[in-house]
């Protein structure tokens, strides 16, 4: 029998000897074992990567919680401005008292510590002072990228364009 004849199909198939069953069984066994080994290693590798990603996600979540706590502890611009105006007012009062003690012949000047004049109240609240938007302005102030903050604002159902205009007066603004 010619080897090329088996390929071309000009062979009487009744004359071809049967395949050895033990050899076929060995090939099938080898294929199954190697395939199972590959799939087990692949699944183990995937599981390892999932565990690693979960750890990274937990670390990121912990860092986010810490960052939110730090943001909550930062005073807002309104509180800082109030404290800054109170300190000069106190020092002006002390100067006035010292001046009146030193110069008894001259009448004391009528320098009353003036409280900062607030502009006439608008109909609403500035966006940066609004209770809903304050934490987002803090996040930008601390250094969180603005696109990420806008995405978070949108996920909470707020208008992200307000972040670009902090002095915008909101008619439906909420104060503390």
Swiss-Prot record:
Region entry Disordered, spans: 84-123, 152-176
UniProt cross-references to Pfam families, sorted A to Z: CCDC53 (PF10152)
Gene3D superfamilies, per database record: 1.20.5.110
Primary subcellular site in the record, as a coarse category: other
Localization per Swiss-Prot or TrEMBL: Early endosome
Gene Ontology BP terms: actin filament polymerization; exocytosis; nuclear envelope budding; positive regulation of cell adhesion; protein transport
Biased composition (Low complexity): 104-115
A GO cellular component entry from the record: early endosome
Alphabetical keyword list: Coiled coil, Endosome, Protein transport, Transport
Role noted for this protein: Acts at least in part as component of the WASH complex which may regulate wash nucleation-promoting factor (NPF) activity and is required for its membrane targeting during endosomal sorting. During embryogenesis, not involved in the wash-dependent developmental migration of hemocytes anteriorly from the tail.
PANTHER family associated with the record: PROTEIN AD-016-RELATED, WASH COMPLEX SUBUNIT 3
Self-association and partners: Component of the WASH complex.
This protein's name: WASH complex subunit 3
Protein's organism: Drosophila melanogaster
Upper taxonomic lineage: Eukaryota, Metazoa, Ecdysozoa, Arthropoda, Hexapoda
């Amino acid at each position: 029998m010619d080897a090329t004849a088996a390929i071309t199909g000009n062979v009487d198939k009744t004359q071809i000897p049967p395949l050895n069953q033990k050899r076929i069984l060995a090939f099938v066994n080898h294929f199954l074992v190697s395939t199972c080994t590959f799939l087990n290693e692949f699944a183990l590798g995937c599981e390892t990567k999932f565990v690693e990603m979960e750890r990274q996600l937990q670390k990121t979540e912990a860092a986010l919680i810490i960052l939110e706590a730090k943001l909550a502890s930062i005073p807002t611009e309104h509180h800082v401005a109030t404290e800054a105006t109170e300190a000069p007012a106190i020092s002006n009062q002390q100067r006035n008292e010292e001046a009146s003690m030193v110069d008894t012949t001259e009448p004391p000047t009528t320098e009353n510590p003036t409280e900062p004049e607030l502009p006439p109240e608008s109909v609403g609240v500035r966006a940066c002072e609004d209770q809903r938007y304050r934490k987002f302005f803090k996040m930008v102030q601390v250094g969180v990228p603005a696109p990420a903050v806008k995405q978070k604002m949108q996920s909470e159902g707020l208008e992200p364009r307000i972040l670009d205009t902090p002095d915008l007066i909101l008619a439906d603004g909420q104060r503390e």
